Amino acid sequence: MLRTLLLALLSIFVSDSLVHFKHSLLIDQYDLEGVEQLKVTKICDYGCHVWGSIPPGTEDSARNIHIDDDFFFNLADIATMYDPFTLGKNPMYIDSADTITIFNNNPNQTTTPLIIYVVSTRASDLNSMEIYDAHNFNRMVFPAKQITIMSPAPFTVTSPKDEKSGNSVVMRTTGFDDVEDSNKDGCFQLMSVADSKTWPGFTVEVSSPLLSLAFDYKKYPDAYLHISTTMGVFGQLDLSAPGFVTSPGYIGCSSGDIFRSSLYSTKVAATITSKGNRHVYLNGDIHSDDSHPVDIIDLKTNNDYPMSGGTAAQSQELFTTGVAVNWNGAGTSNSFALRFSSVAV
């Protein structure tokens, strides 16, 4: 009886740490660590889709994590349900259920890095999106309206310039149903590529579980774009192209929720440089207290421009050849995103 009560209390506590969106949620490795059963309520009451992502080499642990439904799928199975031609991820479908239970059958309920992404059938754009794993994503196709890339490990996304294809795109570290500017969860836009008849390309580094991209599918239905990923981030960014820097596990929605992974760095140390002087625009989504400021250093003057102060949008303009971004708030409830763009002067 006492053991059952303790498990129930622990499940309630752990559920509060999930990353919540209006019609979806994310579960990380620490939500399941030391937990035999994790109960999730309401998200599947009208049916739901479940995607999983795990790093290669962690299949043995993932096989011991089960989603309670009629077929009793394990996470390793779910994470490797791919379309054989595109390597797009296929979900497990759960019919209407007030509560779903996730079982951790690993010895001592240990865990390895993972993502369990549960999306209600109420979510928008379920029929116009594609989902991929970062560790095997390399697509040269007409893009879907929304593309979501998943990984519990940091990754880099690249799309080269293309003079023959045009498009526009916005990016957020959310699922596909929150990537548009009209999203219901108040999620911060990390980057956009303006509407153009030629594709300028981009390279972005991601230390979040999801990166979603929304394209102008109506205007450019035949745009043929190459998008690929490599695992890892290096913190050496190009100031002459727009981009962003975030804290590990950043989501950027009004809930303030943060995703956790043992593969994330404990700090942020990024350098953004160019060959010549530029007028630099920095826009921050800052959820960090005064004890954990986001330090922005002008590499030309060595001046420091800290950003902090709880939940606030902040901005800074500099004339410089480079910017360093440093932050040491990992492991706290703090988070941040810093979006940058510039023009030559």
Regions found by a protein language model. Give the residues of each.
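Domain-level representation of secreted and single-pass membrane ectodomains enriched
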Residues: 15-345
